[in-house]
UniProtKB/Swiss-Prot annotation:
Residues 23-50 form a propeptide. Expressed by the venom duct. The presence of a 'disulfide through disulfide knot' structurally defines this protein as a knottin. The cysteine framework is VI/VII (C-C-CC-C-C). GO terms for cellular component: extracellular region. It comes from Conus litteratus. This is Conotoxin Lt6.4. Its main location: secreted. One of its GO terms (molecular function) is toxin activity. Disulfide bonds join 52-67, 59-71, 66-80. Keywords: Disulfide bond, Knottin, Secreted, Signal, Toxin. Residues 1-22 form the signal peptide.
C-alpha cells in the first residue's frame, strides 16, 4: 500500500508544481506580449500617419505632402496652397 501511495503523491505534487509555474509564466508572458503589441501597433500607425504641411508652409513638389491643395511653385519657392482661378462670364 505504501509503495503505491508514494508515487501517486509524488505525481500529484509534480503536477501541482507544473500548474503553478505554468500560470505564473503565462501571466509574465501575457504582460510582455501586450506591451510589445502596443509598440508594434504604435509603430504601424506612425508609418500610416502621413505628416502633411499646412497651407502656406514649405513643401516638396514631388512628395505631395500638403494637407489641403497642392504644392505650388511661386517665385522659386514651393508652398502649399489652393490655386484659385477666376472665371469670367
Amino acid at each position: 500500500m505504501k509503495l503505491t501511495c508514494v508515487p501517486i503523491v509524488a505525481m500529484l505534487f509534480l503536477m501541482a508544481c507544473q500548474l503553478i509555474t505554468a500560470d505564473y509564466s503565462r501571466e509574465k508572458h501575457g504582460y510582455s506580449a501586450e506591451k510589445s503589441s502596443d509598440k508594434i501597433q504604435d509603430s504601424f500607425y506612425s508609418k500610416l500617419t502621413k505628416r502633411c504641411t499646412d497651407e502656406g508652409g514649405d513643401c516638396d513638389p514631388g512628395n505631395h505632402n500638403c494637407c489641403r491643395g497642392s504644392c505650388l511653385v511661386l517665385q522659386h519657392k514651393a508652398v502649399c496652397g489652393i490655386l484659385y482661378t477666376m472665371v469670367s462670364r
